[in-house]
Each structure stands twice: as C-alpha cells, then as structure tokens.
C-alpha cells in the first residue's frame, strides 16, 4: 500500500511540474500567435492552418485541414491524458473517497455553474447564448504555472486543492462538451452503435486481463473514427478510452521481486565464471527477461499517462495555443456582438471565484466536507481567482460554440483578457494575503 501511495505521489509531483512549466511555454505561444496574427505575416498565418493535410486515394481526399488535425486529432490525445488523470484521481487520489473528493468537487461545480449562469443571463434570447460553456473551463497548466511562481507564498495543501479542483473541472467540461456541443449535422446512430460496441469490447478485454496498451490504442483509434462521424465531438472517445485503460499491472510487485532476484543470482553465478568483459548467453537472457518484467510490473495507466505528459505539455497544447490564440485585432472586430465579451470576462473573473467560494463555504457550513488543513477562506478565494484562467480549455469550447468568425474572435479576445486579469489579480491577492498573514504571525 505504501509503495502504491508513493507511486501516486510521484505521479502527482510529476504532473504539477509538467503542467506548471508548460504554462509558461503556453503563454509564450499565445503571445507569439497574437504578434504574428497582427503582423505583415497575418495572411500567411491564417492560410497556413487551413491547408489540407492527408492523402488522396481513388479520386478522394482523406484528411483534414492542419487546424482540424490540431483541434480534433491532437487534442484527442490531450483529452486521453486528461481522462487518465481523472481515472487515477478517482481510484487513488484526492477524488477517491467522498470525504477527500467532496470539497474540491463541490468547488469545481460552483466554479462551473456560476460563470455559466452569468454568461447565459447576459446572452439569453440571443444567438450567442450557447457560448455559456466558455467561462466554465479552467486551464490547469496556466493556473499551476502561476501558483508555482508564487512559491512558498502558497501552502502545498492549496496547490493540491487547485489540482483536484481542476481535474474535477475537466470532468465537468467533458460532460458539457458531450451534452451541449454535438455536431450541427445531428447524431448518426449507426456510428454511435458501433462506438458503443467498441466500448463494450474495451471493457471486456480489460476484465479478461489484457494489459498490452497497443491493443487498447488500436481499438481506441477505431472508436475515435466512429465517434468523430457520429456527431459527438471526437475528444469524448479519447476520454472513454482512458477509462478503459487497465490499472492493474501484468505481474504483482512480489512476483517481480522474486523474478529479479533469480535473474541477479544467475547473473552473479555466471559473472564469477567469466574470463573477459563479454557477457555470456545466460547473462544476456537474464537481462532480456528482467527488461520484459520491468514493463509487466508497471501500471499501464500510469505508464501511458507519463508517456503522454511531455507530449501534451510541450507539443500539443502549445500548438493548440499558437493555432487558436492568433486574433487579428487590427480588423474590424465587433465587440458588441450580443454580450459575449462581458459574459466571458465576468464569468471567468467574477463567476469563478464567487462560485468556488460560495459553494465550498456552504459545503463546510452544512458539514458535508471541510477545508484542507492549513487552507484559509482567503486561500480558497485566491485559488478561485486563478481558476478563472480559462485560456486553452475556454478556447477549445469557443471553437465548438461559435461557427461565425466574428463571434469566435470576440470570445477569444475576451478569454485572453479575462485569463490575464484572473492571473494577475489572483497572484497579487495571494501575495498580499501572504504578507498580511506573515505580519500577523510576527506580531503574535
């Protein structure tokens, strides 16, 4: 049990480091996109993403635009990692028990409902009402990047709370995408039926003890194809696949230790007989067998998650930011399209902290759950502000919510402004709060 807890702790630490540093890189890519989109290279930037990429066969073209490859295919890999994180947290982490999960989950619910309601109230009875999902999202990479820069000014318990809240927020965002943002062409039930059959197959091979990740990835690609053509956004297939990835390793730790000890004994016995630096056949076989067992003892879920983390953090998400954050503000952008601008900014900057603080406060007063030790209400409010950094996740929802370029551009500018305000104000608030608390401790 202790070894398992250590592995989960290491996974969480690795996750925080990767997400935090990638947040800085994401910011650089977003700024670069804005600079290029407002430079003489603006047309090249826009046209590049619309270039088709694929292959031709029998008179037909099979592929997508570069923009769609990033938003539909690469982002599915990102959502696969998100799904793995959610499953890990549900089974072993801070979402694994009611007492541990209740406080951050209720905070995440408040941080989604209040921003969504604010946006909807401002835009109801307008064509832009369906953008309510935009301010509901949180960009965990940016939020953790900011909280990392604050260092010791923020207690570790608050970092864990923010990570857990963001994971729960991701789960909520996935539900919102699946339910409220289907394809405008409607649902295709034949593809949905095949997708359901593939999900049953994935669940079945998991229960049968199949641990080879290649099998799951292969079936997952077919699942992605069916969901993509069904009318539901393809990233949902990636999340469903993540929940089917096995947790148990092929061999247990005790068996692995016995095998390794046997290999070491063989290696040592043959080493005494060796007359030169070359390994003999039995020693080479022992090394090969030990190598195979190293893979077998690894948890498939954690192994895949660790493999995807750097890919998502330093390639996929920066690419997404660079491809989607470039809005030409020199053009005639109609900032008065309904109340998109106001809805997104108020939702993220005001709605997020208000929703998180109010629902967690009620949660504690009703004795459903309590705050983590060492975390004050001022900390919760500060974390709520940082949760208002929607950025990439909000932009992803914006792409689904708006087909009209004008509405999409306004929402993206609003997301960038709101995320900047939330990050700056949240950071200053937590710094000032730390200084006030430090002075109070000195006086006492």
UniProtKB/Swiss-Prot annotation:
Which top-rank group of organisms is this from?
A: Bacteria
* Primary site of residence: membrane
Q: Does the keyword Metal-binding apply?
A: no
Its keywords, alphabetically, are:
Antiport, Cell inner membrane, Cell membrane, Ion transport, Membrane, Sodium, Sodium transport, Transmembrane, Transmembrane helix, Transport
Which reactions appear under catalytic activity for this entry? Na(+)(in) + 2 H(+)(out) = Na(+)(out) + 2 H(+)(in)
Gene Ontology molecular functions: sodium:proton antiporter activity
What parts of the sequence cross the membrane? Answer: 21-41, 64-84, 102-122, 131-151, 160-180, 185-205, 212-232, 307-327, 342-362, 377-397, 413-433
InterPro entries from the xrefs? Na/H_antiporter_dom_sf, NhaA
A biological process term (GO) from this entry: regulation of pH
Query: Gene Ontology terms, cellular component aspect?
Result: plasma membrane
Lipid bilayer topology: Multi-pass membrane protein
Which Pfam families does the UniProt record give? Na_H_antiport_1
Location in the cell reads: Cell inner membrane
* Family in the record: Belongs to the NhaA Na(+)/H(+) (TC 2.A.33) antiporter family.
Instruction: Summarize the protein's role.
Output: Na(+)/H(+) antiporter that extrudes sodium in exchange for external protons.
Q: Which HAMAP family match?
A: NhaA
Its protein name is Na(+)/H(+) antiporter NhaA 2
């Amino acid at each position: 049990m202790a070894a398992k807890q250590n592995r989960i702790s290491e996974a969480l630490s690795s996750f925080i480091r990767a997400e935090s540093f990638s947040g800085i890189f994401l910011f650089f890519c977003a700024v670069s996109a804005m600079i290029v989109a407002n430079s003489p290279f603006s047309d090249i930037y826009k046209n590049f993403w619309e270039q088709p990429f694929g292959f031709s066969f029998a008179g037909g073209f099979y592929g997508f635009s570069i923009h769609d490859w990033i938003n539909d295919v690469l982002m599915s890999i990102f959502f696969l990692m998100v799904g793995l994180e959610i499953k890990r947290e549900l089974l072993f982490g801070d979402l694994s028990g009611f007492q541990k999960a209740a406080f951050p989950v209720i905070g995440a619910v408040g941080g989604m409902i209040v921003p969504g309601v604010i946006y909807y109230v401002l835009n109801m009875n307008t064509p832009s009402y369906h953008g309510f999902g935009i301010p509901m999202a949180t960009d965990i990479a940016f939020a953790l990047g900011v909280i990392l820069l604050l260092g010791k000014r923020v207690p570790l318990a608050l970092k864990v709370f923010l990570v857990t809240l963001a994971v729960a927020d991701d789960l909520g965002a996935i539900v919102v995408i699946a339910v409220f943002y289907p394809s405008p062409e409607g649902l295709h039930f034949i593809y949905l039926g095949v997708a359901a059959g593939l999900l049953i197959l994935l669940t079945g091979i998991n229960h049968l003890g199949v641990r080879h990740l290649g099998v799951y990835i292969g079936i997952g690609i077919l699942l992605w194809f069916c969901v993509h053509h069904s009318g539901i956004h393809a990233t949902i297939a990636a999340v469903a696949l993540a929940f089917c990835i096995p947790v148990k390793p092929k061999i247990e730790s005790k068996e692995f230790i016995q095998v390794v000890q046997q290999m070491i004994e063989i290696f040592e016995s043959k080493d005494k007989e060796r007359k030169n630096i070359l390994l003999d056949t039995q020693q080479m076989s022992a090394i090969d067998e030990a190598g195979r067992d190293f893979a077998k003892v690894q948890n498939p879920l954690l192994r895949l998650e660790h493999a995807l983390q750097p890919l998502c953090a330093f390639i996929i998400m920066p690419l997404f930011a660079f491809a989607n954050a470039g809005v030409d503000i020199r053009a005639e952008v109609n900032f008065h399209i309904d109340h998109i601008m106001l809805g997104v900014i108020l939702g993220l900057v005001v709605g997020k902290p208000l929703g998180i603080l109010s629902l967690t406060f009620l949660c504690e007063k009703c004795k459903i759950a309590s705050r983590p030790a060492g975390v004050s209400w001022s900390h919760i409010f500060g974390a709520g502000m940082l949760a208002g950094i929607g950025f990439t996740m909000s932009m992803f929802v914006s792409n689904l919510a708006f087909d009209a370029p004008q509405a999409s551009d306004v929402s993206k500018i609003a997301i960038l402004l709101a995320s900047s305000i939330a990050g700056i104000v949240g950071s200053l608030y937590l710094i000032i709060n730390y200084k006030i608390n430090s002075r109070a401790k000195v006086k006492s």
